A protein has these predicted regions:
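Catalytic-core signature of thiol
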Residues: 1-148
Length: 148
């Protein structure tokens, strides 16, 4: 369901399937850059329940308004966020320590911010989701990508 307007547009993204594809793309388990993942999805594709899926194109998104437009036009986007030692319960809490980076799906938005889905399961945030306020946007993402 599209969390912006309640329509039936499918916003479910299997981040684990994309990450797991790197086994054939890279010989080591040091993570994967967005550019490598998107290149793989465009040229090799990712197996889904509905068959092999390939993206046609991808591009970076750099602003709140551009991200909103990309979600409406293309569906979920992917973004890289810093990971703090408080990240299992909340994105960031005062006094938290930086531990690394992580990819998430940005699946929708409302008047207060973006709805984020993580691949860590239902124990993370609020049943696997969290809400990122617009005022925290510029200090949150390393990069954001949209794809068609």
């Amino acid at each position: 369901m599209n969390l912006k307007d309640g329509s039936e547009k499918d916003n479910d993204v299997d981040l684990k399937a994309i990450y797991d594809s790197r086994v054939d793309f890279k010989d080591e388990d040091n993570g994967m850059t967005f550019k490598d993942a998107l290149h793989f999805m465009r040229h090799e594709g990712v197996e889904t329940d509905k068959g092999l899926y390939k993206i046609k194109e991808y591009s970076m998104v750099g602003s709140i308004e551009a991200l909103k437009a990309a979600i409406v036009m293309n569906g979920p986007c992917i973004g890289g966020l810093p990971v703090y030692d408080s990240s299992i319960d909340e994105f960031w809490l005062e006094g938290s320590n930086l531990e690394g980076g992580h990819a998430v799906a940005i699946i929708g938005y409302d008047k207060e911010g973006f709805i984020i889905r993580n691949s860590w399961g239902s124990m993370y945030g609020y049943d696997g989701y969290y809400h990122l306020k617009y005022e925290d946007f510029n200090n949150s993402f390393y990069e954001i990508w949209t794809m068609v």
